[in-house]
Regions:
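Internal amphipathic alpha-helical repeat/solenoid segments
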Residues: 28-71, 76-119
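Extended ligand-binding clefts on enzyme/binding-domain cores
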Residues: 2-31, 35-38, 43-44, 62-66, ...
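Aromatic-rich carbohydrate-recognition surfaces in CAZymes
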Residues: 62-69, 117-142
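Solenoid-repeat scaffolds in large eukaryotic assemblies
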Residues: 72, 84-85, 147, 154, ...
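Short glycine/serine- and small hydrophobic-enriched flexible loop segments
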Residues: 73-80, 129-140, 199-206, 271-278, ...
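Outer membrane beta-barrel
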Residues: 83, 87-91, 95-96, 123-134, ...
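Solenoid-like repeat scaffolds
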Residues: 349-359
Length: 382
């Protein structure tokens, strides 16, 4: 029997399983959205601009990134907030979209909050979230005109992502045409395990331009296979950046800094695996991965290292995580994969953890929102 919400329409509410009341859960989700979008200046990450624009701020770096802008759009479409969605999308299309040059059709990954570009290159995790949010917007609200013809914008963006550089055109594709794996950035030939969203690619395979659909179907399989290589067989941990064979990327530390460890970007990987399982139920390996991951944090790592830095084999590396609330959130989200004692303990810990405040709140609270959305059965396919 086929599993997954795409077949059954069922999105499990793990908070209810942990003993929380449905009304309490829904109220908390609304409160989280209101805090992130309309809270005090010390709480919010969303800023409306004028009558029809808005942006999501990376409060630690004081900029607007395609990561955050696309996350904000996904938050809005999931919560049925069309005005805020359109404001963020128009800001991105106005200031981030590149209409010419070798990256034409992509979005500059970082801009100042005044719209000034900080970079001329894209980051593929932004593009894939933009596309998915746009498809969902089309299906929830219908297509409008111009940049608000959501589905057409998504299709064109995805086409650029996989065909850029063909037929002598300048630039490079975001996905490698030989192995169907997403690149960390277009200029390099290694990946970031947390960029791999097979549950998105399955839907792209249904909704993209017809000539692109077989590519996305292959990309979904390639990403599921890749995650098995990138995640450690004992701990379940993965690195921030990894080679195409899944091994941690150790080169270029003078350029990128160190990223061969379980650290900031890598937290998203287990959350993505969990959502893939909820939506598609395509691979029982994902359940085993969830068990390994939870066992590592709940037994092996111990309470004193819940916010630690680790090599992917579980070796403790000196220092503390920059985003401890994000770690708490994704530990809980692993509870979508397996509902054992470890999982429920992590879910309850997350429930009792407030949103982060201070200048590092942006990344933590984005992962917090998505974890709460998923655990409450509200991170849905539209």
């Amino acid at each position: 029997m086929e599993k997954g919400a795409v077949y059954t329409g069922i999105y499990p509410n793990i908070f209810e399983l942990a003993g929380y009341e449905k009304k309490e859960i829904e109220n908390r989700l609304d409160q989280i959205f209101q805090t992130l979008f309309y809270g005090s200046d010390e709480e919010r990450i969303y800023h409306p601009v004028g009558c029809d624009l808005g942006y999501i701020e990376d409060t630690g770096n004081l900029d607007a990134r395609t990561e955050g802008m696309s996350y904000g759009m996904m938050m809005c479409v999931q919560m049925n907030k069309k005005e805020e969605f359109d404001r963020i999308w128009k800001w991105a299309r106005t200031y981030m979209y590149m209409a010419e040059g070798e990256n034409a059709g992509y979005f500059a990954w970082s801009c100042g909050t005044d719209g000034t570009r900080n970079a001329d290159g894209p980051a593929p995790d932004g593009e894939e979230f933009f596309a998915m949010a746009l498809f969902f917007a089309s299906h929830r609200w219908g297509d409008g005109e111009g940049i608000f013809a959501y589905s057409e914008e998504a299709k064109k963006l995805l086409h650029t992502c996989i065909h850029k550089g063909e037929n002598g055109e300048p630039g490079r594709a975001m996905w490698d045409s030989k192995n169907y794996l997403i690149r960390f950035i277009t200029e390099v030939d290694f990946s970031d395990p947390s960029y791999h969203l097979p549950h998105f690619y399955e839907l792209f395979a249904q909704w993209s331009f017809e000539e692109d659909r077989s590519f996305w179907k292959k990309a979904a399989k390639a990403s599921r296979d890749y995650l098995k290589k990138a995640c450690h067989p004992v701990t379940g941990l993965c690195a921030e950046y990894a080679e195409y064979d899944g091994t941690p990327y150790t080169k270029g530390q003078n350029i990128w800094g160190r990223h061969d460890w379980y650290y900031s970007d890598a937290y998203r990987t287990i959350a993505n695996i969990a959502l893939d399982y909820v939506w598609f139920g395509a691979d029982e390996w994902e359940v085993e991965e969830g068990k390994r991951f939870l066992e590592f944090f709940c037994e092996t790592a111990g309470e004193e290292h819940q916010d630690g830095i680790f090599a992917i084999d579980g070796t403790v590396i000196p220092g503390k995580a920059l985003h401890p609330v994000a770690m708490t959130a994704v530990h809980a989200q692993a509870g979508l994969l397996v509902q054992n004692e470890h999982a429920l303990a992590c879910v309850r810990k997350f429930w009792n953890t407030p949103l982060r405040t201070g200048n590092r709140r942006y990344y933590d609270n984005c992962l917090y929102f998505f974890a709460f959305l998923a655990l409450s059965g509200n991170y849905r396919i539209y």
